Amino acid sequence: MKKLFSLLFLTLMTLPIMAQKNVYKFSVKDGNEHTVKLKDYKGKVLLIVNTATKCGFTPQYETLQKLYETYKNQGLVILDFPCNQFGAQAPGSFRDIHTFCTGNYGTTFPQFAKINVNGRNESPLYTYLKAQQPFKGFDMNNNIGKFLDEKFRAENPDYAKDPSIKWNFTKFLIDRQGHVIDRFEPTADMKDVEAGIKAALKMK
């Protein structure tokens, strides 16, 4: 009974978030803890990414920066949200993380304060993103995808039905109207991510 009431409470709490029609009602904190309203990005194509500096996927920063440089003049903005929930792979302060990313990968896209993307203290933005685009499955054509699938399946055979963020560098693609139009798991080919970005940039 107690679990039922807890589930009901969480459902009621998230209903206003689920009812949102786009990402523009949400606000986030930048590295200096200043509020940034996502409505400031109206008309842009957004790629929202939860990141980490000590992860096997961290080199994706290089590709993300190249994508940003290639498409920013067409309207692409990449929003970087460091998250320490997966293997504690985003340690340190915002300054530590920002210095690492700019020094090692030359990143110039916006980077925000560290957040949680799952659980009781998750960012409301991520509650919304996950509700709009569920888990898409790992790429089973590479060894990392197979490893992650085995890892999560051992913990929960039905893990794929859970929309939660599974690991660092999960990406959500937002169109120019603020709608969440796609999700890319960390094992997704970055060429597919680029193709999604190009298609979104062509949309009116």
List each model region and its residues.
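Thiol-based oxidoreductase modules, predominantly thioredoxin-like and allied folds used
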Residues: G75-G92, T108-G119
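Conserved helix-turn-beta segment immediately C-terminal to the redox Cys motif
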Residues: K44-V45, T53-K54, T58-P82, C101-Y105
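Bacterial Sec-dependent N-terminal signal peptides
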Residues: M1-K21
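N-terminal "domain-start" segment that seeds a small globular fold
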Residues: M18-K39
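Amphipathic alpha-helical repeat scaffolds
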Residues: D30, N50-K54
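Non-catalytic, surface beta->alpha helical segment in thiol-disulfide oxidoreductase systems
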Residues: D182-M203
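Thiol/selenol-based redox catalytic cores and closely related redox-interacting motifs
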Residues: G106-P186
